[in-house]
């Protein structure tokens, strides 16, 4: 027979394991979200930020400041998820980055930001 103390400990341990697995799962980006982000990026962002995410486009020659280079070495420390979502949602003052909050849903904005981070920023050294 199991003691009440051991039973309580096992229940708490089980709860913690379930909680941690739920937290870990919430940080996983479903494939469909990445696919949606890719679609949005190529339709709406690529013209300024480029196919490679480096901002080397015709737009870079005519916009000041030039579009953000998502492949630069300093970009990971410069751009957090929160800052990127805010920039896409509200736009960036004194730049050509327009607000997308009336065009894209919150889920679409998060999908495109996740795509940018995964595609262009995750391989930074």
Predicted regions mapped to residue ranges:
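Inter-heme linker and motif-flanking segments adjacent to c-type heme-binding CXXCH motifs
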Residues: 54, 118-125
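Short cysteine/histidine-rich zinc-coordinating motifs and their immediately flanking basic loops
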Residues: 58-62
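Bacterial N-terminal signal peptides that target proteins for export
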Residues: 2-13
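The canonical Cys-X-X-Cys-His
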Residues: 37, 41-51, 112-116
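Electrostatic cytochrome c docking/interface patches
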Residues: 22-40
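Extracytoplasmic electron-transfer domains, predominantly the class I c-type cytochrome c fold
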Residues: 63-118
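Bacterial N-terminal signal peptides
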Residues: 11-21
